[in-house]
A protein has these predicted regions:
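ATP-dependent carboxylate activation and anion-phosphoryl transfer catalytic cores
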Residues: 2, 8, 27, 32, ...
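A short, GP-enriched loop/loop-strand-helix hinge that lies immediately N-terminal to
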Residues: 19-67, 80-127, 142-150, 568-575, ...
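A conserved helix-loop-beta module that forms one wall/lid of the active-site cleft
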Residues: 110-179, 661-722
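Catalytic core of soluble alpha/beta enzymes
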Residues: 116, 157, 183, 213, ...
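C-terminal amphipathic alpha-helical interaction region
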Residues: 498-550
Length: 938
């Protein structure tokens, strides 16, 4: 069936600010859907309140509404635009819930708007736990025994009938919000109350717990003719009991028998074809008894999800893009495979590689939180490793996490207490994979580990093989590792750093020996959807150790852009936005743009964005070999946050050109002592400070600069481990904590300017001229991290004298550091005197906010200035902002009950939204201003 020609304009509802359970995967799906619809000549209007998204860019949509995701905004858009249809399946639970609300209020009917890709009956059936249970039983598909409860009394009655352990699952929530396991009566009351409160309909399902069963997900597509394909089968490494967003997952499924797979496939087809009339993507989850192979249905999501983004990157099949086409009437057999461009989209991808996804947590930001994993998602991001084997993919994923590990094992950071280790293994701690490895090294039998964790023995044996390899290497010197053993070790995913640790050598020595003497190098393979059966046209690669290379090197001039790795607090979607715009500008400037990143949720890892995508850990060894393969003109590190910036020193030492600001200038800005010397030279005020290596030295510095002081480690992002302290005892505690996480770190102690105001500037310098992109004044006082502050653009209360000082200092610093491209400077203002707190010679988390508020493509300009192809005078700067824009932080405290919500110098927000106000009389602004100091803590 060809497309529905009556649809000429579509509204896509976004997912809003990043929260735990709903992250950048919806920016990826929304951007893909918008591009897909525009290819068909359809006008796309977008509603989203998140300024850090690519989907809210003029390059993606025809009309963008950066506004709260609520009914008022929907009505405003429908009054202002001729909208024929709405696509609510690209914005997660937020978009789906809003679409349902508008439907119940009769808004879609009133404005004659067709709902695409979703069926309200299907949404109601899948989101309402009781309706889903009945639907499954009608189809003859088993579910866990359960009862619905709409009150505390009904919940207690259900628990009595089912018995413990049991599960509480609230209706209409995302990321398992309010859900949890209950092992006994003592826990039940509190968890039931939380579940009822979390559900917007105050309804929960009380369900028998199937702890220890294996969990699988099928990512499927269906069109209007009931054509059906399974895009990807994902197996959870962790058994039932841990939210799939907190589970390590593997594709293709490694331990699934063909009989069980075929049965699951038949169930999924039956479910998706019988649930309603929608066309698009759907995620179906099953649990399988590891002994009997009995199958029960857990849940289904008739929309694009976190798993869809993972499945798209795992297979190369662009689910959101195809789902958008199906929503406007196309059928699968009418569409082309987007990778081969020759075969049909009506096919099931075949993988000749393995992917492993590992979540990324930020428990260190939520002191006192329960770190045990369960039904409620707690991860803030994720990474994906691609390899020829499970072991290689697992090691690459571990190398991508940026958690001070260099892979799984072989880094001297193992747990030594068997009790601590087994507790972490049994209670499903966030670092369970590392504790499992350590337990095996200590000789804990696999049978014991399997009984404690219920993880499939196949996976445990794979990890045991890695432990055995490590033991073998420990007995050898580097030169005793022959070519066969080296190849075997590298095929298992071990990094050169791990081999160096085991052989008591250096990473460089291992690299030289491996590549020069043994001639063992990485080759690059295509992610092609068809296991190399057809030629792929999409340049999407991963590295492995094999004989044939599938990544031809062109003779064009090339630039590599380093991505920002996994989402985490302090470094989120903002930096992915910067990377994508950098890549697009590089292409416009006539270079070949090469993207390197390991985050499956993001737009930067969409194979359609760069000329070449390397899905690799942003890890020195992988970058080094990629540079030797592609021989680029240089590498851009300014756009990928601290992840990319940390590799600047290695690039500098290797003699690779860093595009834009030089390594030495970056080091001056990052090194507090060098930066303070520069400020002194420029006659720019800064708070008194000192550096220390231990607690005794820190106390001496504090005496000199005066309490209160801000104590912090060097070279971190998001205010990691920063504290405001008021006496020697607190200072000692702060220093000990920093040294525990950052051994040998240079600790900085600054005099804290109490009751100062805070402001920041983002600017571009081209070697001649400075362009101030924006001056933002924080509503909250100094002491609350800039990422957790409400920032107002332009300033609302700073005097002309203060603004002049800030402009003057920005220009002085940019010239002195000889910046090429972007710089962010943070200021404290006290008694009309301006102090410089820090300078960041890179894109900042406020860069996208300014671009959106003023509607100026500053990142495009900055990238072209870094490349040296343009000067600031070549561009126009018309700031289209009436009134003020406020950058509002958004928190995910509800995922961590009982955790203090106080704010301080360490960042805790997971996302942000933008709000436009006409003037300072706006009631929303006045309310924010009244509360500005309430949350300040140490």
């Amino acid at each position: 069936m060809p497309k529905d020609t009556s649809i000429k304009s579509v509204l896509i509802i976004g997912s809003g600010p990043i929260i735990i359970g709903q992250a950048c995967e919806f920016d990826y799906s929304g951007s893909q859907a918008a591009r897909s619809l525009r290819e068909e000549g359809i006008e796309v209007t977008l509603l989203n309140s998140n300024p850090a998204t690519i989907m809210t860019d003029p390059v993606v949509a025809d009309n963008v509404y950066l506004a709260p995701i609520n009914i008022d905004s929907i009505v405003k858009i429908l009054n202002e635009r001729q909208i024929d249809a709405v696509l609510p399946t690209m914005g997660g639970q937020t978009a789906l819930n809003l679409c349902m609300e508008a439907y119940e209020l009769g808004i879609w009917e009133k404005f004659n708007v067709k709902v695409l890709g979703a069926d309200f009956k299907a949404i109601e059936t899948t989101e309402n736990r009781e309706a889903f249970r009945k639907f499954m039983l009608e189809l003859g598909i088993q579910v866990a025994p359960s009862y619905v409860a709409n009150s505390f009394l009904e919940g207690k009655e259900a628990a009595q009938k089912i018995g413990f352990p049991l599960v509480i699952r609230p209706s209409y929530t995302l990321g398992g919000t309010g859900g949890g396991f209950v092992h006994n009566k003592d826990e039940f009351d509190e968890k039931l109350q939380r579940g009822l409160a979390a559900s917007p309909t105050h309804e929960v399902l009380v369900e028998k717990a199937v702890l220890g069963w294996k969990e699988y997900e099928l990512e499927v597509m269906r069109d209007m003719n009931d054509n059906f394909v399974v895009i990807c089968t994902v197996e959870n490494f962790d058994p039932m009991g841990i939210h799939t967003g907190d589970s390590i997952t593997v594709a293709p499924a490694m331990t699934l028998s063909d009989t069980t797979y075929q049965k699951m496939r038949d169930y999924a087809k039956l479910m998706i074809t019988r649930i309603g009339t929608f066309a698009g993507g759907c995620n179906v989850q099953f649990a399988v008894d590891p002994v009997t192979e009995d199958i029960i249905s857990v849940e289904m999501n008739p929309r694009v999800s976190r798993s869809s983004a993972l499945a798209s990157k795992a297979t190369g099949y662009p689910i959101a893009k195809i789902a958008a086409k199906l929503a406007i009437g196309y059928t699968l057999d009418e569409l082309k495979n987007q990778v081969t461009k020759t075969t049909s989209a009506f096919f099931e991808p075949a993988l000749d590689y393995v992917i492993v996804k590992i979540p990324r947590w930020n428990f260190d930001k939520f002191a006192g939180s329960d770190e045990t994993l369960g039904l409620q998602m707690k991860a803030v991001g994720e990474v994906m490793g691609i390899g020829r084997s499970f072991q290689e993919a697992l090691q690459k994923a571990c190398q991508s996490l940026e958690n001070n590990r260099i892979g799984l094992g072989a880094d001297g950071k193992q747990w030594v207490s068997a009790d601590d280790m087994l507790q972490g293994v049994g209670n499903a701690s966030w670092d369970r994979i590392f504790r499992l490895y350590d337990a095996m090294k200590l000789g804990v039998p696999l049978k014991t580990l399997q009984e404690v964790t219920r993880i499939d023995p196949w996976y445990l044996n794979q990890i045991m093989e890695l432990v055995d390899t490590e033991k073998k290497l420990r007995k050898l010197s580097l030169k005793q590792i022959d070519a066969n053993l080296m190849r075997e070790v590298k095929e298992k995913g071990y990094s050169d750093l791990q081999i160096a640790y085991l052989t008591n050598t250096t990473e460089d020595e291992v690299y030289e020996y491996r590549t020069k003497e043994l001639n063992i190098r990485r080759v690059y393979k295509l992610v092609d959807t068809c296991a190399a059966e057809f030629e792929a046209k999409t340049p999407y690669y991963y590295s492995t150790f094999d004989t044939t290379n599938e990544s031809p090197v062109s003779d064009k001039k090339k630039i590599i852009v380093l991505g920002s790795g996994p989402n985490r607090i302090g470094q989120g979607i903002e930096f992915d936005y910067c990377c994508v715009h950098g890549v697009l500008a590089i292409k416009e400037a006539g270079y070949e743009a090469i993207m390197m990143n390991c985050n499956p949720e993001t737009v930067s890892t969409d194979p359609d964005i760069a000329d070449k995508l390397y899905f690799e850990p942003v890890f020195w060894e992988h970058l080094r070999e990629l540079i030797e393969h592609e021989k680029p003109e240089g590498v851009i590190v300014q756009l990928g946050g601290q992840t990319a910036l940390k590799l600047a020193e290695n690039l500098h030492n290797m003699g690779v050109k860093i595009i834009g600001t030089s390594y030495d200038s970056m080091d001056i800005a990052e090194d507090r002592e060098r930066f303070s010397d520069l400020l002194k030279e420029l006659n720019i005020p800064y708070p008194d400070y000192g550096a220390a290596k231990n607690a005794e030295e820190a106390i001496e510095v504090a005496k000199k600069v005066g309490y209160p002081v801000l104590v912090r480690p060097s070279y971190v992002l998001g205010g990691q481990r920063m504290r405001i302290v008021i006496n020697d005892e607190e200072l000692t505690q702060g220093v000990v904590k920093i040294l525990k996480f950052f051994p040998d770190n240079n600790i900085l102690i600054d005099h804290f300017l109490d009751r100062a105001e805070e402001a920041e500037v983002d600017a571009i310098y081209d070697g001649e001229q400075v362009e101030i992109m924006g001056i933002m004044e924080h509503i909250e006082p100094a002491g609350i991290h800039s990422g957790d502050s409400n920032a107002v653009l332009p300033p609302y209360n700073l005097s002309e004298n203060v603004i002049t000082q800030m402009r003057e200092y920005t220009e002085k610093i940019a010239r002195a550091l000889d910046i090429r491209g972007l710089i962010n400077i943070q200021f404290a203002i006290k008694n009309e005197k301006v102090y410089v707190i820090e300078a960041n010679p890179r894109a900042s988390r406020t860069t996208p906010f300014i671009c959106k508020a003023y509607n100026i493509p500053y990142l495009n300009y900055a990238t072209k200035i870094m490349l040296g192809v343009n000067k600031l005078k070549d561009f126009t700067y018309y700031k289209r902002l009436l009134g003020y824009a406020i950058k509002e932080p958004v928190f995910s405290f509800d995922k961590f009950p009982g955790v203090s919500r106080e704010l301080g110098p360490e960042m805790k927000s997971t996302g942000e939204s933008i709000r436009f106000i006409n003037d300072l009389y706006d009631p929303y602004f006045r309310d924010l201003y009244k509360k500005k100091s309430m949350m300040l803590s140490k």
